[in-house]
Design a protein with these regions (language model features):
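N-terminal secretory signal peptides and thylakoid transit peptides that target proteins
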Residues: 2-18
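A charged, well-structured terminal subsegment
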Residues: 247-261
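A short glycine-rich beta-strand->turn/loop micro-motif centered on a GG-aromatic cluster
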Residues: 194-198, 216-230
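C-terminal segment of N-terminal export signals and the immediately downstream linker at the start
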Residues: 25-47
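Active-site-proximal loop->helix
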Residues: 228-241
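Short Gly/Thr/Asp-enriched flexible loops that form oxyanion-binding sites at enzyme active sites
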Residues: 204-214
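Short amphipathic alpha-helices and their capping/turn segments at secondary-structure boundaries
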Residues: 48-63, 95-102
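Active-site alpha/beta core segments
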Residues: 85-188
């Protein structure tokens, strides 16, 4: 995949935060206002997925993965707040997915995976070094500010339970390298993986590809994910849906789970 060096981490701070009580309103209006991105970008299922019973697939031993849904992207003052994800609907859709998965007895692995934008202390190649530096160029964050930037956003922090896994991605775009995730999935005999998070065309696609190659059945919740820009989401969802994993909405996920309850 070819991405502009700065496409993942545009670092202009300043998107205004909204109250948690407005989440449901945001879900209905954020994408609808422009008709671009979010739930509007979810394509019809690719023909091959129509051969499967997705409700049955979702009834198998399953894991949930939230990737890079941190304060950096959702909260005012975050290094990536200019992308305005709080206003774009992925957060309430994610809450809907997590609440439904918690009620399903076959979901026995919940993974909250951070992605630090400040990566000066990470192992890095020459490509990594210049790319990581470009994400935070011009920012003057203290160590405490950097830590807070990578904290799980508050609405999702409230959903974390004892026994959940919290760790950071260490590779460029996947949690399947350099983390405990492969061992977690193997020990719990996971078959199906449900993905939400940011960025859709980076870590979500990267993890969906890695999951497929490792023999898992990934399903991407389109409206619980987002690209840097809404207009990038339709192409990303179409690519993922055509080649790597079914892309469905949060509402469809809830509906499919209810068929097996």
């Amino acid at each position: 995949m070819n991405f502009p060096v700065t496409s993942r981490r545009q670092t202009l701070a300043g998107a205004a935060a909204i109250a948690a009580t407005s989440l449901l309103v945001a879900e209905k209006t954020a994408s609808a206002a422009t008709g671009v991105g979010g739930i509007n970008a979810i394509p019809p299922l690719a023909a091959q997925w129509g051969e499967l019973d997705l409700a049955e697939i979702l009834s198998r031993p399953a894991a949930y993965m939230s990737v890079s849904q941190n304060k950096s992207l959702y909260d005012a003052g975050g290094a990536q707040a200019s992308e305005r994800h709080r206003e774009r609907g992925s957060l309430p859709a994610t809450v809907k997915v997590v609440n439904a998965a918690r009620k399903a007895s076959n979901f026995n692995s919940f993974n909250w995976i951070g992605y630090e934008v400040f990566r000066e202390n990470y192992p890095q190649s020459d490509f990594d070094r210049v790319q990581y530096a470009s994400w935070t160029k011009g920012l003057n964050f203290t160590p405490e500010m950097k830590k807070q930037d990578n904290d799980l956003v508050g609405e999702l922090r409230a959903l974390v339970r004892p026994g959940d896994n919290e760790f950071n991605e260490l590779a460029l775009q996947t949690a399947f390298a350099g983390t405990q995730l492969p061992l977690e999935l193997a020990r719990k005999k996971i078959q199906t993986i449900v993905l939400t998070g940011i960025h859709l065309d980076w870590c979500i696609e990267g993890n969906a590809r890695a999951a497929r190659d490792a023999g898992y059945l990934p399903i991407v919740i389109g409206d619980a994910c987002a690209c840097q820009k809404p207009e990038q989401e339709a192409a990303a969802m179409e690519r993922i849906n055509n080649f790597f994993a079914p892309v469905i909405s949060a509402d469809r996920f809830v509906e499919l789970l209810s068929k097996r309850s």
